[in-house]
Amino acid sequence: MPTQRKIETVQELTEKLSRAQLVVVADYRGEGRGMSVADMTELRRKLREHGGEVVVAKNTLLKIAANHTGRGALDPLLAGPTAVTFAYDDVAKVAKALLDYLKSGNKSFTVRGALLGQALLPADALEQVTKLPSREQALAQVVGGIAAPVSGVVGVLNAAISNVLYVLQARIDQLQPQSSS
C-alpha cells in the first residue's frame, strides 16, 4: 500500500516531468563517497539561476511518474542512486550550467543520459544540447523567416509604384510646351 508521502512525491515528479523540456538523469554518487551537501547545494543554485532544478528521488517513484507522463523511455536510465535535472524553459542554458559543473572536476556526478522532448539521448549528447538556440533566438528565427517574404513583396510593390511614377512624370514632361531657348 503506497504511503501518502509517496503518492505526493509521484504527483510532484509527474508535474515536473510534464513541464520539463529536457530531463537529465545522473548518478550523484559516482566515484568515492558521492556528492557533499555543499556540492549539491551549489549545483542546485546554478541550475535554478537558469530555470532548472535537480531532484534526488527513488527510481520506482520516478518510473511511475515517467509512465504517467508518457516518458517511459527514461526507464533504462533509472538504476542506482539517481539525480534528475529538469529544464523547463531555456534548455541550452540549463544544459550549459550542468556541463560547466561537470567540467569543474566533480567526479561524483555522472550523467547517464537525457530525454529531450520524447527523444532519448546518450550522456555525451549533452554538449550538443548546449548548442540549441534559446527560446528567444528560435522565435526570432521563425519571425524572421515569416517576415522575409513579406518584406520582399513590399520591396517589389514599392519598385513597381516608383516605376509607374517615373513613367507618368516623363509623359508629363513630354506634354508640357517646350520653353523657347
UniProtKB/Swiss-Prot annotation:
<dbReference type="InterPro" id="IPR001790">
    <property type="entry name" value="Ribosomal_uL10"/>
</dbReference>
<comment type="similarity">
    <text>Belongs to the universal ribosomal protein uL10 family.</text>
</comment>
<dbReference type="InterPro" id="IPR022973">
    <property type="entry name" value="Ribosomal_uL10_bac"/>
</dbReference>
<comment type="subunit">
    <text>Part of the ribosomal stalk of the 50S ribosomal subunit. The N-terminus interacts with L11 and the large rRNA to form the base of the stalk. The C-terminus forms an elongated spine to which L12 dimers bind in a sequential fashion forming a multimeric L10(L12)X complex.</text>
</comment>
<keyword id="KW-0687">Ribonucleoprotein</keyword>
<dbReference type="InterPro" id="IPR043141">
    <property type="entry name" value="Ribosomal_uL10-like_sf"/>
</dbReference>
<dbReference type="GO" id="GO:1990904">
    <property type="term" value="C:ribonucleoprotein complex"/>
</dbReference>
<keyword id="KW-0689">Ribosomal protein</keyword>
<protein>
    <recommendedName>
        <fullName>Large ribosomal subunit protein uL10</fullName>
    </recommendedName>
</protein>
<dbReference type="Pfam" id="PF00466">
    <property type="entry name" value="Ribosomal_L10"/>
</dbReference>
<keyword id="KW-0699">rRNA-binding</keyword>
<dbReference type="GO" id="GO:0070180">
    <property type="term" value="F:large ribosomal subunit rRNA binding"/>
</dbReference>
<dbReference type="GO" id="GO:0006412">
    <property type="term" value="P:translation"/>
</dbReference>
<keyword id="KW-0694">RNA-binding</keyword>
<dbReference type="GO" id="GO:0005840">
    <property type="term" value="C:ribosome"/>
</dbReference>
<comment type="function">
    <text>Forms part of the ribosomal stalk, playing a central role in the interaction of the ribosome with GTP-bound translation factors.</text>
</comment>
<dbReference type="InterPro" id="IPR047865">
    <property type="entry name" value="Ribosomal_uL10_bac_type"/>
</dbReference>
